[in-house]
Amino acid sequence: MTTRIDRRMAKLKTEGRPALVTYFMGGDPDYDTSLSIMKALPGAGSDIIELGMPFSDPMADGPAIQAAGLRALKGGQTLVKTLKMASEFRAGDNETPIVLMGYYNPIYIYGVDRFLKDALASGIDGLIVVDLPPEMDEELCIPALKAGINFIRLATPTTDDKRLPKVLQNTSGFVYYVSMTGITGSALADTGKVAAAVNRIKGHTDLPVCVGFGVKTAEQARVIGANADGVVVGTAIVNAVANVLGPKGEKTADPAEAVATLVSGLAQGVRSARLAAAE
């Protein structure tokens, strides 16, 4: 069974360019604004959307994404509403892949079987659950794969050749290479090391490898995209939302417009990546 992620990645491979994968926090700063951000992403140049599920204890996230999650929770965002957001987006876009990203606890409380059924019905294509190691694949990964949802695993600079096959064992859709250790939103890693790491991962899998953590500008997206199948941008997008919110959360400009402007520039960087690499 091929998913929207598989089809999108195959299409981009024939076009000879990497994917731009964009992360935003569902419900930040409120449901309607967040939905308008999501709807603006494909037109601005996003190839795959990562929809963040807010959680009260986001241990892998840096201050920007933590703050976005808290704003979303304060605004009343729940997993039910996040799935509803995906469903509303799907009503107008049946092509752009959606990956839910977050932590296992809200899914566990929701109920795995119910969650997978509702996620499929909402048009979800993949899951990134950062706190579920391969040793717990029976919990969610295997049921998700059986349901036809990609389970995307993270690899890091500390994932050595002994550990890598285990990490890749039930991974599908793409591999998400976290280009540094630590929390999201840290400084960009050395690009030469990133290229070597991508090649090392590709020695173990035929899956596309997308690189994230630290990409903020079109130039960074271009450089990373020259050696990867996809470039993931998250913190910069979350910051674009935060930057148009006042001290009490009031909007000083349109968050969807701010995000679209940023993503448009990133998309240009990604689209020029292979051209630059070929020169």
UniProtKB/Swiss-Prot annotation:
Keyword hit for Membrane: no
SUPFAM superfamilies assigned to the protein according to its UniProt record, in alphabetical order: Ribulose-phoshate binding barrel
Highest taxon in the source lineage: Bacteria
Assembly: Tetramer of two alpha and two beta chains.
Keywords for this protein: Amino-acid biosynthesis, Aromatic amino acid biosynthesis, Lyase, Tryptophan biosynthesis
Lineage, uppermost ranks: Bacteria, Pseudomonadati, Pseudomonadota, Alphaproteobacteria, Hyphomicrobiales
Protein name according to UniProt: Tryptophan synthase alpha chain
Pathway assigned to this chain's UniProt record: Amino-acid biosynthesis; L-tryptophan biosynthesis; L-tryptophan from chorismate: step 5/5
InterPro entries assigned to the protein according to its UniProt record, in alphabetical order: Aldolase_TIM, RibuloseP-bd_barrel, Trp_synthase_alpha_AS, Trp_synthase_suA
GO cellular component: cytosol
Stored PANTHER family: TRYPTOPHAN SYNTHASE ALPHA CHAIN, CHLOROPLASTIC (PTHR43406:SF1), TRYPTOPHAN SYNTHASE, ALPHA CHAIN (PTHR43406)
Record field: catalytic activity: (1S,2R)-1-C-(indol-3-yl)glycerol 3-phosphate + L-serine = D-glyceraldehyde 3-phosphate + L-tryptophan + H2O
The family this protein is said to belong to: Belongs to the TrpA family.
Enzyme Commission code: 4.2.1.20
Catalytic residue positions: E50 (proton acceptor), D61 (proton acceptor)
Gene Ontology molecular function, alphabetical: tryptophan synthase activity
CDD domains in the cross-refs: Tryptophan_synthase_alpha (cd04724)
Pfam families assigned: Trp_syntA
Protein function: The alpha subunit is responsible for the aldol cleavage of indoleglycerol phosphate to indole and glyceraldehyde 3-phosphate.
